[in-house]
């Protein structure tokens, strides 16, 4: 079974990694789909984000990393996904994600959305929070994979020592 895990991943966090690792164990194959959204100004280019994810997931089998723009359901069909995977940190995530899941189901009736609750130790993480901490020189090595922490430190000229 193939799961499509879409997102901006700007940057990839340990919360994302937790979901990817659990999804591989549950579904066998995971396509991580990096959104190219022209309406946002990301910290990292799509190619950089793909590289970060490939580096962070190199220890896993069954991972593909692709980019997409447009509708998630089109990406899922293109990559022959059986389901769309979404992570939930809090009830506020659920309300938004449920609306999107219903919309996706209206566009592709055979495509299910599966929600995984984020592990408690990562429930506070978001890419926005990580960027904010890094922007002001705080340590992010406990929030993101090692390679991503290095990229963030370079991006924001941070010299904060690792925790």
UniProtKB/Swiss-Prot annotation:
Keywords: ATP-binding, Coenzyme A biosynthesis, Cytoplasm, Magnesium, Nucleotide-binding, Nucleotidyltransferase, Transferase
Main localization category: cytoplasm
Sites annotated Transition state stabilizer: 16
Domain of life: Bacteria
Pathway participation: Cofactor biosynthesis; coenzyme A biosynthesis; CoA from (R)-pantothenate: step 4/5
GO molecular function: ATP binding; pantetheine-phosphate adenylyltransferase activity
EC primary class: transferase
Cofactor(s) required for function per UniProt: Mg(2+)
The protein's Enzyme Commission number: 2.7.7.3
CDD domains with a match to the protein in the record: PPAT
Compartments where found: Cytoplasm
Positions contributing to substrate binding: 8, 40, 72, 86
Function noted in UniProt: Reversibly transfers an adenylyl group from ATP to 4'-phosphopantetheine, yielding dephospho-CoA (dPCoA) and pyrophosphate.
Subunit field text: Homohexamer.
Name the UniProt record assigns to this protein: Phosphopantetheine adenylyltransferase
Lineage: Bacteria, Bacillati, Cyanobacteriota, Cyanophyceae, Synechococcales
């Amino acid at each position: 079974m193939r799961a499509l895990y879409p997102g901006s991943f700007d940057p990839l966090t340990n919360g994302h990694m937790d979901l990817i690792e659990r999804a591989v164990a549950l579904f066998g194959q995971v396509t991580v789909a990096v959104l190219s959204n022209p309406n946002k100004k990301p910290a990292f280019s799509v190619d950089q984000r793909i590289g970060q994810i490939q580096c962070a997931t190199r220890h896993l089998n069954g991972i593909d990393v692709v980019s997409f723009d447009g509708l998630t359901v089109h990406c899922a069909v293109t990559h022959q996904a059986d389901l769309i995977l979404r992570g939930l940190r809090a009830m506020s995530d659920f309300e938004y994600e449920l609306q999107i899941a219903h919309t996706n189901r209206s566009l592709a009736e055979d495509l299910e959305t599966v929600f995984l609750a984020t592990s408690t130790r990562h429930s506070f993480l978001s890419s926005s929070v990580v960027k904010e901490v890094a922007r002001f020189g705080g340590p992010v090595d406990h929030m993101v994979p090692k390679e991503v922490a290095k990229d963030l430190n370079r991006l924001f000229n941070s010299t904060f020592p690792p925790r």
